[in-house]
Swiss-Prot record:
<dbReference type="InterPro" id="IPR038068">
    <property type="entry name" value="YcgL-like_sf"/>
</dbReference>
<dbReference type="InterPro" id="IPR027354">
    <property type="entry name" value="YcgL_dom"/>
</dbReference>
<feature type="domain" description="YcgL">
    <location>
        <begin position="1"/>
        <end position="84"/>
    </location>
</feature>
<protein>
    <recommendedName>
        <fullName>YcgL domain-containing protein VIBHAR_01387</fullName>
    </recommendedName>
</protein>
<dbReference type="Pfam" id="PF05166">
    <property type="entry name" value="YcgL"/>
</dbReference>
Amino acid sequence: MLCSIYKSSRKEGTYLYIPKKDDFSQVPDTLMQMFGKPMPVMTIKLDGRTLAQVDVEKVKASLINDGFFLQVPPPPENLLEKYKEQKAQQKGE
């Protein structure tokens, strides 16, 4: 299965996967407005491949069922909370 990947011009770290290059007909208009101008990244074959940030099987299922897949960046890590948790664990040992 081939898919084309586009980077958002408005939301950093946000990518849109679609099954056909430059065919955004299955993507809701409201999503396209929030996404901004799609900037082409690459076209790849998904079969037998792994992706760094997302499960390739979820991408394939979404492309088949919805006609697109939206990859959003993970939420920012709260380093202060992580530090507090580590300190609490050290005190408990």
